[in-house]
């Protein structure tokens, strides 16, 4: 059975979007009989690499799934945040030799578009489980 770490980027002023993504991630894990051994909530997507690294260091974590959303604002800030998070998570995965999957939606999307993509939480978990099983 695969044991997962789950990182949840909380930057969602209404709260429901991220809560739905996290719940989709938990349901996907349960559906595959994987165990989420720890969840770490962080303020935003930019903060996810550090939390993913802490989880990837643990001997009881086979893979880490990261969920969150980067919604478009009035500047290019969303692009900068999304790029930094994606690169940071890739670095963690390679440095720790542990699957770290990206379930952060965006950038360049509206709140409505983000809401339509809550299933990415489940996709991140599915990918994490597949990688942990295939790379064993």
PLM features: residue spans?
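Generic structural signal for well-ordered alpha-helical scaffold segments
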Residues: 26, 53-56, 90, 129
